[in-house]
């Protein structure tokens, strides 16, 4: 194999990062040397590799299997939970920008003080064909209405979801149910403590009680949980009340505009209560992860798991009930900077979130998580490292707020790939400049009040409340980014050693 001599020693593979030129490679705003920033970003990547590397540790894998098995137990009690191979697990929690759920309050959790690593799990509880009359898209607000007839595919869906029904769609003047089915090129807070013997009923604005990455970023199926009371393997259940003759043709007794809707608030309430009932019945098993906290915040059920072996980690999983829609919105983009993105079939999600113009009103929001996962695989590694560093710097500034900044930062990542040359983004020595560029772009977006939606042409993502205060905090951070990165590296070192740092809501883990 041919080799090249670098500094008198043979080197196989790509050349190392070129050293920065001290007199020219300096950040004009802060005076920081870009070479130092890049080195700090690389150190941050090393310290965070325990939870974000290509080969997760055994504790992370056990925690993932625990959550999948927990959902499997819920499926045994309520077959509306999906049976198998329908889960999408993503690295990073909702508060770190894994998804856009609007500006609803998502609790006091902050990576570092409350948990060491976070993940988001999409749990499809309903699926439909986007070309039918059941789906109404409101592309102005990037939201949708899901109407339920008496029968769908021979199943009495309205009877099955009777406890989650809402009123009919108020008006359809600005809505459409147009999606195409061909393949897509892009393819109030409730809490439960397992130590108690009761499950509180979901109520709006209930205060949080005291409590003690995608690992593979792919679809996963349930596995049996470590529980002496449920040693048998998971089986797919059916309910006589839900079954109907598959050959029966739906004959709705009223027009589609009179159909009741599937209410996202009721769905998330049902999702949490069912999960909490099973969590309360779990028997701790030595060597297995321990569920120390579960709570519902808007459309998200957040659980914290403590790993059993040292170094002890506290892992956060945001579980979200979603609707899978087959088809593709007519106004959605079909190409990225890397060309068409291949997928098995055209589909997207509906997730429970808050409406952009009415933060206090819940609704189904369009979500393209599977396409974003494919996009991430096309992003150059140095730019991903720069984004991770920018996330780490942003994290303490938005902790406990309703700010949409983390997902805005993620969207800026996609627009950067559209705008900048791939060779520039792929050079390791440019990571420092890219990190500062993302933060500067975010400040401009906060000042403008909106950012163009990456997937829906002509639509915008809103910045939400608190943008002025966040702009001020970002300006202060930009005055000394090197110091902010050093603090992020130290925080990552603490998380790597094991946390359980501070209890959520003042409790202990």
From Swiss-Prot:
Extracellular side: 1-312
Claim: Cell membrane is one of the keywords in the record: yes
UniProt biased composition (Low complexity): 207-224
Biological process annotations from GO: apoptotic process; positive regulation of cell adhesion; positive regulation of T cell chemotaxis; positive regulation of T cell migration; regulation of mitochondrial outer membrane permeabilization involved in apoptotic signaling pathway; response to cytokine; signal transduction
Keyword terms of this UniProt record: Apoptosis, Cell membrane, Membrane, Transmembrane, Transmembrane helix
Cytoplasmic side: 330-509
Entry's Gene Ontology cellular component terms: cell surface; mitochondrion; plasma membrane; protein-containing complex
Region (Disordered): 167-236
Biased segments, Basic and acidic residues type: 174-204
SMART domains membership: Mab-21
Broad class of where this protein is predominantly found: membrane
Signal peptide: none
Transmembrane segment boundaries: 313-329
Membrane topology: Single-pass membrane protein
Subcellular location: Cell membrane
Function summary: Selectively involved in CSF2 deprivation-induced apoptosis via a mitochondria-dependent pathway.
Subunit structure: Interacts with CSF2RB; this interaction occurs preferentially in the absence of CSF2.
Annotated protein name in UniProt: Transmembrane protein 102
């Amino acid at each position: 194999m041919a080799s090249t001599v670098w500094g008198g020693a043979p080197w196989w593979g790509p050349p190392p990062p070129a050293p920065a030129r001290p007199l020219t490679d300096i950040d004009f705003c802060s005076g920081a040397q870009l070479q130092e920033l890049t080195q700090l970003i690389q150190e941050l990547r090393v310290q965070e590799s325990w939870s974000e590397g290509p080969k997760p540790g055994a504790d992370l894998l056990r925690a993932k299997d625990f959550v999948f098995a927990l959902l499997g137990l819920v499926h045994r009690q309520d077959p509306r939970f999906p049976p198998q191979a329908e889960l999408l697990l993503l690295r990073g929690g909702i508060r770190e920008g894994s998804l856009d759920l609007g500006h609803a309050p998502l609790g006091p959790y902050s990576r570092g003080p409350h948990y060491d690593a976070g993940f988001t799990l999409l749990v499809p509880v309903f699926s439909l064909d986007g070309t039918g009359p059941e789906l109404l898209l409101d592309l102005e607000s990037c939201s949708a209405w899901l109407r339920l007839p008496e029968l769908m595919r021979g199943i009495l869906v309205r009877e099955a979801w009777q406890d989650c029904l809402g009123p009919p769609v108020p008006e359809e003047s600005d809505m459409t149910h147009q999606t195409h089915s061909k393949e897509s090129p892009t393819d109030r807070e409730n809490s439960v403590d397992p130590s108690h013997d009761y499950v509180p009923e979901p109520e709006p604005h209930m205060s949080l009680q005291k409590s003690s990455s995608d690992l593979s970023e792919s679809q996963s199926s349930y596995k049996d949980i470590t529980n002496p009371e449920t040693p048998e393997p998971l089986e797919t259940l059916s309910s006589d009340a839900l079954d109907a003759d598959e050959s029966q043709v739906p004959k709705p007794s009223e027009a589609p505009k009179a159909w009741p809707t599937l209410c996202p608030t009721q769905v998330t309430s049902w999702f949490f209560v069912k999960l909490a009932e099973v969590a309360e019945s779990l028997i701790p098993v030595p060597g297995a992860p321990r569920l120390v906290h579960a709570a519902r915040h808007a459309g998200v059920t957040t659980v914290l798991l403590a790993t059993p072996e040292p170094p002890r980690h506290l892992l956060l999983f945001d579980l979200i009930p979603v609707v899978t829609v087959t088809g593709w919105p007519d106004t959605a983009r079909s190409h990225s900077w890397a060309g068409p993105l291949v997928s098995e079939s055209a589909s997207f999600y509906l997730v429970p979130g808050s409406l952009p113009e009415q933060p206090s009103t819940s609704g189904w929001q369009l979500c393209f998580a599977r396409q974003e996962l494919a996009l991430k695989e096309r992003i150059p590694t140095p730019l991903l490292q720069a984004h991770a560093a920018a996330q780490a710097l942003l994290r303490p500034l938005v902790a406990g707020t309703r700010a949409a900044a983390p997902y805005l930062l993620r969207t800026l990542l996609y627009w950067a790939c559209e705008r900048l040359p791939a060779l520039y983004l792929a050079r390791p020595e440019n990571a420092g400049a890219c990190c500062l560029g993302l933060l500067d772009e975010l400040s401009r977006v906060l000042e403008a009040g909106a950012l163009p939606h990456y997937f829906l042409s002509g639509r915008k993502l809103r910045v939400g409340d608190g943008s002025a205060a966040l702009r001020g905090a970002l300006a202060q951070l930009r005055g000394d980014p090197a110091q902010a990165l050093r603090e992020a590296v130290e925080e990552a070192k603490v998380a790597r050693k094991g946390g359980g740092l501070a209890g959520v809501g003042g409790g202990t883990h």
